[in-house]
Amino acid sequence: MHNDSNSGAPGTPSGRIRRRRGSNEVPPEVVKANGNHLLVNDRSKYKSMLIRAYSSVWMIGGFAFIIYMGHLYIWAMVVVIQIFMAKELFNLLRRAHEDRHLPGFRLLNWHFFFTAMLFVYGRMLSQRLVNTVTLDKFLYKLVGRFVKYHMVTCYFFYIAGFMWFILTLKKKMYKYQFSQYAWTHMILIVVFTQSAFTVANIFEGIFWFLLPASLIVINDIAAYFFGFFFGRTPLIKLSPKKTWEGFIGASITTIISAFLLANMFGRFQWLTCPRKDLSTGWLDCDPGPLFKPEYFTLPEWFPAWFLSREIAVLPVQWHALLLGLFASIIAPFGGFFASGFKRAFKIKDFGDSIPGHGGMTDRMDCQMVMAVFAYIYHQSFIVPQNLSIEMILDQIILNLTFEEQLAVYKKLGQIIQERTFGES
């Protein structure tokens, strides 16, 4: 229904009555993104676009520099992002009045956070840490002890936090404290599930981190610009500013970009080689069949102005198309979920750490969904399912002492010698 603005005189009570908007209605500030109005016609939106573009340029530049620095620096970047996300989410349900009566309660949240960090990264990177110190006997034994007792150490850290929480319980504050305890654990699950898969992708080869992350960025930028200049039709009520024009335009752009970026990234060993230790040196490896070009001859009807009748395609580019399809169709639902979450708590953004973009969590909503899919896809369709020599050696180095490894070496030599004499 549409109320006539002239139906009541300004001086009458009826003229002062304000109609209450329904919860599922499109807010007036975003109506111009739909119907017959375009955001491009709203001059006030250009300032917001410029701020957003300026922040994006700085983020992309910093991201490119960290990629150049290598695996460890990318991991450090992920840790920093985790800390920002946790801070934003911890603050979401905080109430200043209750916190004043609970000194040290915030510190307890961070105790659980760093305990979770030690557990997740300790399990994920223990083998690479062992590979890094193999040549130093003292460090090798020290790291071996850490790996052996890692789980029990993390358990006692957690139990210490659990006891700390119980001892801080105060009368009339139980409900608030238990809600914060549950909220903290939910945050840890969300943040560390995403980051664990992200870090695993990094050490499998920067390619498997960089391509999915880049596709989300491209999809986000393309959706913004297609929606800004052409958006008319609302896509979903949870995000009234999202339009079908932006969604479709971004999907096409993302899928094409996936095919082209895979070809570009796949030609650099720095991006394709997995990192087996925690060093920062240059990588040199056999890229494998996925990153070796295959040549295709274009048909005769292809336009004559094309530079060559033969094109080189990396097999990984076909996999990239599926990643691009997921990034453009499925991953945006992570953003829709975040939009619904923010509406539930009546907030515009999770934070304000990135001008024009909101908080770090606002930038990571789709990335979380994409990182998990990229890891599962890589493990299911890219990594060989049979045991490799490297995997067997990793298990020997990780689980056996130096004396046991020496015994395996002698026994293996004996078996090979017996087989050699038997064949002769």
Swiss-Prot record:
Cite the annotated pathway: Phospholipid metabolism; CDP-diacylglycerol biosynthesis; CDP-diacylglycerol from sn-glycerol 3-phosphate: step 3/3
Cofactor: binding comment: Requires a divalent cation for activity.
Task: Enumerate the UniProt keywords alphabetically.
Answer: Lipid biosynthesis, Lipid metabolism, Magnesium, Membrane, Nucleotidyltransferase, Phospholipid biosynthesis, Phospholipid metabolism, Transferase, Transmembrane, Transmembrane helix
- EC number from the UniProt entry: 2.7.7.41
An annotated GO cellular component of this protein is: endoplasmic reticulum membrane
Topology versus the membrane: Multi-pass membrane protein
Q: Where are the transmembrane segments?
A: 60-80, 102-122, 149-169, 183-203, 206-226, 246-266, 321-341, 369-389
Subcellular locations according to the entry: Membrane
Q: What is its main location?
A: membrane
Signal peptide (residue range): none
The protein's required cofactor(s) are namely: Mg(2+)
Q: Which domain of life is it from?
A: Eukaryota
State the Gene Ontology terms under molecular function.
phosphatidate cytidylyltransferase activity
Q: Which reaction does it catalyse?
A: a 1,2-diacyl-sn-glycero-3-phosphate + CTP + H(+) = a CDP-1,2-diacyl-sn-glycerol + diphosphate
Q: What class of enzyme is it?
A: transferase
**Its Gene Ontology biological processes?**
CDP-diacylglycerol biosynthetic process
Tissue occurrence = Roots and sink leaves.
Q: Which PROSITE patterns match?
A: CDS
Similarity annotation: Belongs to the CDS family.
Report the protein's function: May be involved in the synthesis of minor phospholipids and in modulation of IP3-mediated signal transduction.
**What's the protein name?**
Phosphatidate cytidylyltransferase 1
